[in-house]
Amino acid sequence: MKYVYYYDTVIDPRQDERWPDKNTQERFQEIVKGYHLDSTMFLAPTTIRKQIDLWPEGNRFVRLLERESGEKTFLRVYNDMYHHPFETEITAAFKRLVMELPKVGFLTGHGERDVKKIGDRDYNTFTWDKPFRNSLLNQGFDVEEVNLNSPIPKDINILVIAEMRSELLPTQKTNLDQYIARGGNLMILSEPKRKEYMDPLLAEFGVKLVPGQLVSISEDHAPDLVVVKPTKEGQELIYHFDQIAKLEYVVVNPGVSGLEFNPEKGYKAIPLFETDSLVWNEMQTTDFVDDTARLNPDLGEVQQRYNTTLALTRKVNGRTQKVMVFGDADCISNGELSSGHKGIRASNFTLIPGSFFWLSDEEVPIDVRRPTPPDDLVYLSEKEASTWTIILRWIIPALMIILALVIWLRRRGR
């Protein structure tokens, strides 16, 4: 692999703070001086730009993969503790060179979550954030924004509708219905306050938002912070969700609606995540800071287990159409993916590879699982383990020392 060293302008607040009055060339000289590097080994901005435009990559270190026929793709490094790509990212990059991979369209025009913005409620992190390992771009997907003013392009494999905040116009509804009728896969994410706009859409799939907002009483967290776990059916359907359960993680929903399903529309439903039995649909309280949520059955509040995520399927045009419905749109937002909740072992980011793996018919992200080796289990009781600890840590080393002394004494005697 050929490596080319260069320097160019980057977005780096630390450099701006350290050298506020210096330009790119002057900053470059300061850096090479500090690292004792030869400045002549680096191509200047004007030179590297003649070879390739790396501004869309943030002028970061990247690897360019290129075929003789001209196809190109980037293999990036990431802002995590491992930095370099794993087998999943490497394989996805090579597959991108030789085949068409799924394209995900994100609906716009009705106040949906924005894939370009980095605000807490938006979706840039898991879609277009190139330094984020688990973003769709790095896992083999293409991403683009879609509006319903014209028919949805035929190369869109998965359509994401994340919290519409206004109703569809008749022509827009027609274009969406055409996509659904042709068997396109969808991911639909709602919010408790968007029932007015989301229920008409969800009704086409036999799904309805439970009135109110789910709450659960906690000593440490707000009532509207609801923790859900994968169902047994969800673990069997998507292996990523099985990993959440095995590692005893959960998914956090900061404001979520329960989901009800009716099979009259021809879909089959599989519940993926559910609450515990102490959760209820709060109909009255909306201020969970200064007010207290209390169960009131007279208002239609019911304390029970609620499904918060559903997987729907039906046969269309000889293939299986897949629809995934969430009662919460914040669970995979920028803010939720970049924050934590003390005392809660959350794994919300696992929703991304798991959901899109299923929606892409298990094409990407790449499944790199391997059969478990047959000799990786040691059957020892706690008492036996303690015994072997003593043998390995003390008895065997002592025998080795005694043997060494015997050999030394015999040689000395000779």
Label each region the model flagged.
Residues 1-131, 135, 364-368, 377-394, ...:
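Hydrophobic targeting/anchoring helices
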Residues 4-8, 107, 146-148, 212, ...:
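Conserved beta-strand termini and adjacent loop/short-helix elements that scaffold enzyme active sites
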Residues 67, 76-77, 108, 273-276, ...:
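Pocket-edge structural micro-motifs
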Residues 124-364:
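Acidic, S/T/G-rich, low-cysteine, solvent-exposed domains in lumenal/extracellular/periplasmic regions
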Residues 218, 372-374:
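A glycine-rich phosphate-binding loop feature that marks nucleotide/adenosyl-phosphate handling sites
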